[in-house]
Amino acid sequence: MITKNKIVKIIELAKKCNECALHHFKKFDKKSVNYKDDNSPLTKADVEVNNIAVYGLQKLFPNIEIISEELYNSKHIFKNNKYFWLIDPIDGTKEFINKSPNFTVNFALVKHNLPIFGLIAQPTTGTIWYNFNNKAWKLDKDQDFKSSQIIQCKGINYKKLRTLSSFNHRSKELEDWMSFVKPISDQDIGSSIKFCYLAEGKVDFYPRTSPTMEWDIAAGHSILKSAGGNVISDSGIEIKYGKMKFLNDIFLAHGKTKNIPHKFLIKLKNKNFDNYDKDLQESISELKKENLVVFPTETVYGLGAIGSSKK
């Protein structure tokens, strides 16, 4: 589906999107901002980059449905095919409006509800991140495909955790989570660049307790996974795509690790871990009294089926 030749052409398309976005960024005037029905900002850059991206991907992949932030509305009839594209022409529109360089162009190809290819381009630096052949890559400005460098997550040191988040979306739940895990550093970064920093091994966790849309994170998810990390829900299951209204709930993006401490996920739900652990131990004790056992499901953080342990 994604061949080397297709990657080269997608990168060329991303560079065209970068040029368009940067052109508008340099001459941007806040008076030109419009607002959508949900009160989110819309700029000329959003519209024009979207047109370039959609036209380019339709030309390369004529039979694959494209879901774009700027084309989607609640009445959209999603075909939920085997493959579909998720596009965010300007991820971090607030950063763009406030003249911050941290906005991106995002493309993601989804297969069976999981992202298999992602590309994130940062117009202000010309940097492009993408994944291909189960590896994550970084391409600096004015370089061609052959100059791409492999990037990888670093193993998480739980005694020296490094986190990042967007201070524009800082909730009480997120503040509580940060106080609980006690990172040695917490960077404020907008847009999907957060996933790129994770993929490069610069940080360990990106927690999110406020809503996002699938096109916000799918490209970063794909790149991060190829770099050795992942994006999971508060139940410990990998985030899926093609959900109702393309809306994400709470998630935790992480670097390379064998296991995420389940107390991190419990706290992400804003639950008291001590009370949760106490209730869990009491439930286990009651199960043992009745000679019952629990069969785990896909997630180890929830109960599955209950049956007798008697032979």
Regions found by a protein language model. Give the residues of each.
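N-terminal subdomain of lithium-sensitive/metallo-dependent phosphomonoesterases centered on the IMPase/IPPase/PAP
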Residues: 1-90, 176-179, 266, 277-302, ...
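Oxyanion/phosphate-interacting regions
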Residues: 1-18, 178-180, 194-292
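Residue-level signal for inorganic ion chemistry
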Residues: 21, 46, 57, 93, ...
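Short glycine/threonine-rich catalytic loop with a Thr-x-Gly-x-Asp
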Residues: 46, 96-97, 217
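Conserved beta-strand segments of alpha/beta enzyme cores
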Residues: 65, 184-185, 230
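Short loop/edge segments at beta-strand edges and connector loops
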Residues: 68-70, 190, 235
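DPxDG-like acidic metal-binding loop motif
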Residues: 78-140, 146, 305-310
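Phosphate/pyrophosphate- and phosphate-bearing ligand-binding catalytic cores of soluble enzymes
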Residues: 148-220
